[in-house]
Curated annotation (Swiss-Prot):
This is Shikimate dehydrogenase (NADP(+)). Its EC number is 1.1.1.25. Keywords: Amino-acid biosynthesis, Aromatic amino acid biosynthesis, NADP, Oxidoreductase. GO terms for molecular function: NADP binding; shikimate 3-dehydrogenase (NADP+) activity. The lineage of its organism: Archaea, Methanobacteriati, Methanobacteriota, Methanomada group, Methanococci. One of its GO terms (biological process) is aromatic amino acid family biosynthetic process.
Length: 280
């Protein structure tokens, strides 16, 4: 039960009504028996600055940042973790000693989720679709030990991101880039980081056709609502192993939770909470 000592955590983005983060985090909070609550807030771009100053004034413990604010939130923060700074996007903010500090846990979440189905990720040929905030985090984490290609509807954005991370990570083999017509037959892993197919706009075509994928390819979509987005339905038709965004949501959320509270939540409890929501 909330009282005057309850600490507030939250999620900001637009939209947020589809999010499973509140039930996931609140279940973890209840499991640990700590006095916190996690709420979702639909925030427009013009109110981002006010959100950060308000969070500091109200002594909110911290909040997650989702689409479309992961990049623009950075200019309103007091400090940014070195990895988040290199990524160029923030998905987690902690308010500490009156300062808003930004972190990024998306890349770690994506990597841990992929490794559950694809094994250790070393020297894999990976195709990343999209160049937004989530893409930046995933690229930064996966490019360290693998061969990446980034594609985007706007090829110039893909080029800028590939060149930026090739330089930051001192890649001997530069990150490749292309447009949405790139031949996909040689990729071990294909990962969609765009919101194409996300609730409520689910009646759309897949972001790229998948008929030429490798026989044993792993296809991941960061979308988790719907559970089986159109991109994964397409992948299943061609025999691919598929992963939706639920695992990443849990793993990145667990790292965020630890940043805020100093406590490790139970991953199983968080997954179970989401699965119970899905069945409703």
């Amino acid at each position: 039960m909330m009282d005057t000592k309850t600490k507030l955590l939250g999620l900001i983005g637009h939209p947020v009504d589809h999010s499973f983060s509140p039930i996931m985090h609140n279940t973890a909070i209840e499991d640990l028996g700590i006095n916190y609550v996690y709420l979702a807030f639909d925030v427009s771009e013009e109110n981002l600055k006010n959100v950060v100053s308000g969070a500091k004034a109200l002594q909110i413990t911290g909040f997650n940042v989702t689409i479309p604010h992961k990049i623009n939130i950075m200019k309103y923060l007091d400090e940014i973790d070195e990895d988040a700074k290199a990524i160029g996007a923030v998905n987690t903010v902690k308010i500490e000693n009156g300062k808003a500090i930004g972190y990024n846990t998306d890349g770690i979440g994506a990597k841990r989720t992929l490794e559950e189905k694809a094994g250790i990720l070393i020297d894999k040929n990976i195709l990343i679709i999209g160049s937004g905030g989530a893409s930046r985090a995933v690229c930064f984490e996966l490019a360290k030990d693998n061969n990446l290609t980034i594609i985007n509807r706007n090829i110039e954005k893909a080029k800028i991101l590939s060149e930026e991370f090739s330089k930051k990570l001192k890649k001997q083999k530069p990150i490749n880039y292309g447009d949405l017509d790139l031949d996909i037959k040689n990729f071990d892993i294909i990962l969609n980081t765009t919101p194409v197919g996300m609730h409520p706009n689910t009646n759309v075509d897949p972001v790229i056709p998948l008929k030429n994928i490798k026989k044993d390819a792993v296809v991941m979509d960061l979308i988790y609502n719907p559970i089986e987005p159109v991109f994964l339905k397409e992948a299943i038709k061609y025999g691919a192993k598929t992963i939706n965004g639920l695992g990443m949501l849990v793993y990145q959320g667990a790292v965020s939770f630890e940043i805020w509270t100093g406590m490790k939540p139970d991953i199983y409890v968080m997954k179970k909470a989401i699965n119970s929501k899905i069945r409703l």
